[in-house]
Amino acid sequence: MFAGLPSLTHEQQQKAVERIQELMAQGMSSGQAIALVAEELRANHSGERIVARFEDEDE
């Protein structure tokens, strides 16, 4: 479970995707780009936060 994840609007999500794609076009790996954008979102987000739980369905 992850606490304190930013709750993003569709527009904010779209901008994050575009930023990730931009970083990848500049040669960054997808994992690095996602991590960087996630860090930026956490640092700059001032809205609501959600609690998310991710489970592996293979178990």
From Swiss-Prot:
Disulfide links within the chain: none
Alphabetized InterPro entries for the sequence: UPF0181
Pfam families referenced in this protein's UniProt entry, alphabetically: UPF0181
HAMAP family xrefs: UPF0181 (MF_00507)
Recorded family membership: Belongs to the UPF0181 family.
NCBIfam families listed in its UniProt record: PRK05114.1
Name of the protein in question: UPF0181 protein YoaH
Source organism of the structure: Escherichia coli O139:H28 (strain E24377A / ETEC)
Highest classification ranks of the organism: Bacteria, Pseudomonadati, Pseudomonadota, Gammaproteobacteria, Enterobacterales
Gene that encodes it: yoaH
